[in-house]
Amino acid sequence: MAVRLCDVASLLRSGSWAAEPWTGQVIAAMETQLSNGPTCNNTANCPNTINCSSPVESNNTEDSKTNLIVNYLPQNMTQEELKSLFGSIGEIESCKLVRDKITEGQSLGYGFVNYIDPKDAEKAINTLNGLRLQTKTIKVSYARPSSASIRDANLYVSGLPKTMTQKELEQLFSQYGRIITSRILVDQVTGVSRGVGFIRFDKRIEAEEAIKGLNGQKPPGATEPITVKFANNPSQKVNHTILSQLYQSPNRRYPGPLAQQAQRFRLDNLLNMAYGGIKSRFSPMAIDGMTSLAGINFPGHAGTGWCIFVYNLAPDADESILWQMFGPFGAVTNVKVIRDFNTNKCKGFGFVTMTNYDEAAMAIASLNGYRLGDRVLQVSFKTSKTHKA
């Protein structure tokens, strides 16, 4: 490891790599690791890494020997920087930073790099796996070809002790199989654990065994049993076509198929994965102690509910994005984007009505401070001080 890190650090100091914005940071990280010794390969004794284990064994297909998955990338790292970093090892055929489609291109913290030469892919794993960038320790391994045995192996875990660390969460679940990724959700303002986490296993059968063994059990430090279940049941995924059709009928009450609990937590996971580091910014329209306003009516809708004010929307924002963001938290009865009379462009704010207070409060807690494109949304219950439609 030390020799390879030295080689890469030397390469980065020379030639075209020296001008890259990330070069200094990578070199510093490599030099720190060289002075501290080899990167830890044992998760139990390595608190700063997440599943920092030996590379995944290679599959038999030729493509799998060149295609790598890179996890735990810094949130602000671009695809160009990812390509430059791995391009320092060898010639790359393709590189892709995975982005959130709903949030207009925000990085999800992982990507894929496909080399021309399998030897370069192997060298990249041996050289860059476990490298610490900013607050992240990146994990580099062979990407697995898609198959039924590895799909839907992501678990949602609730009821965790607020004091449980990510390392302890992995230790609890590691007895059932190889863990690919893990995460504990934290409050965006206080940083305190929300008692909810996610574990992704290498194979679905491992996830099934974890459910059998841990669902309803009390882990160390817990006062209540934890809930363990699949987080991404395909039958609970958002059907955007149906969602759009529902919106086309303004007098039809939204039945809330997106309110299923698993889907709600799945979106919550995505939001926290992508934007957990952003501090929430509260609406300039004062929130009067999470005041509820029952009986709010929008033009064309006579229902009652809890009205939510959404501020700092982009000029091209439309109602469908509000459906997509708020639907997973519960039953939505109406959405409205306020538009300029002359241009028909969004004036920067809109309203969402939800039938259940707890679901509305959860949506506010999760989406206030949420970055949509280049804008940070401000979400609160509608008050008398809020803009009027």
From Swiss-Prot:
<feature type="domain" description="RRM 3">
    <location>
        <begin position="306"/>
        <end position="384"/>
    </location>
</feature>
<protein>
    <recommendedName>
        <fullName>ELAV-like protein 2</fullName>
    </recommendedName>
</protein>
<comment type="subunit">
    <text>Part of a ribonucleoprotein (RNP) complex, at least composed of elavl1/elrA and/or elavl2/elrB, igf2bp3/vg1RBP, ddx6/Xp54, ybx2/frgy2, lsm14b/rap55b and, in a subset of RNP complexes, stau1/staufen. Binds RNA as a homooligomer.</text>
</comment>
<dbReference type="InterPro" id="IPR034914">
    <property type="entry name" value="HuB_RRM3"/>
</dbReference>
<dbReference type="GO" id="GO:0032991">
    <property type="term" value="C:protein-containing complex"/>
</dbReference>
<dbReference type="Pfam" id="PF00076">
    <property type="entry name" value="RRM_1"/>
</dbReference>
<feature type="domain" description="RRM 2">
    <location>
        <begin position="153"/>
        <end position="233"/>
    </location>
</feature>
<comment type="similarity">
    <text>Belongs to the RRM elav family.</text>
</comment>
<dbReference type="GO" id="GO:0005938">
    <property type="term" value="C:cell cortex"/>
</dbReference>
<keyword id="KW-0677">Repeat</keyword>
<dbReference type="GO" id="GO:1990904">
    <property type="term" value="C:ribonucleoprotein complex"/>
</dbReference>
<dbReference type="GO" id="GO:0017131">
    <property type="term" value="F:uridine-rich cytoplasmic polyadenylylation element binding"/>
</dbReference>
<keyword id="KW-0687">Ribonucleoprotein</keyword>
<feature type="domain" description="RRM 1">
    <location>
        <begin position="66"/>
        <end position="145"/>
    </location>
</feature>
<dbReference type="InterPro" id="IPR006548">
    <property type="entry name" value="ELAD_HU_SF"/>
</dbReference>
<dbReference type="InterPro" id="IPR000504">
    <property type="entry name" value="RRM_dom"/>
</dbReference>
<dbReference type="GO" id="GO:0008298">
    <property type="term" value="P:intracellular mRNA localization"/>
</dbReference>
<dbReference type="GO" id="GO:0000122">
    <property type="term" value="P:negative regulation of transcription by RNA polymerase II"/>
</dbReference>
<keyword id="KW-0963">Cytoplasm</keyword>
<dbReference type="InterPro" id="IPR034999">
    <property type="entry name" value="HuB_RRM2"/>
</dbReference>
<dbReference type="GO" id="GO:0003730">
    <property type="term" value="F:mRNA 3'-UTR binding"/>
</dbReference>
<dbReference type="GO" id="GO:0042802">
    <property type="term" value="F:identical protein binding"/>
</dbReference>
<keyword id="KW-0217">Developmental protein</keyword>
<dbReference type="InterPro" id="IPR002343">
    <property type="entry name" value="Hud_Sxl_RNA"/>
</dbReference>
<dbReference type="InterPro" id="IPR035979">
    <property type="entry name" value="RBD_domain_sf"/>
</dbReference>
<dbReference type="GO" id="GO:0045892">
    <property type="term" value="P:negative regulation of DNA-templated transcription"/>
</dbReference>
<comment type="function">
    <text>Binds to poly-U elements and AU-rich elements (AREs) in the 3'-UTR of target mRNAs. Required for the vegetal localization of vg1 mRNA. Probably required for nervous system development.</text>
</comment>
<dbReference type="InterPro" id="IPR012677">
    <property type="entry name" value="Nucleotide-bd_a/b_plait_sf"/>
</dbReference>
<dbReference type="GO" id="GO:0005737">
    <property type="term" value="C:cytoplasm"/>
</dbReference>
<keyword id="KW-0694">RNA-binding</keyword>
<dbReference type="GO" id="GO:0007399">
    <property type="term" value="P:nervous system development"/>
</dbReference>
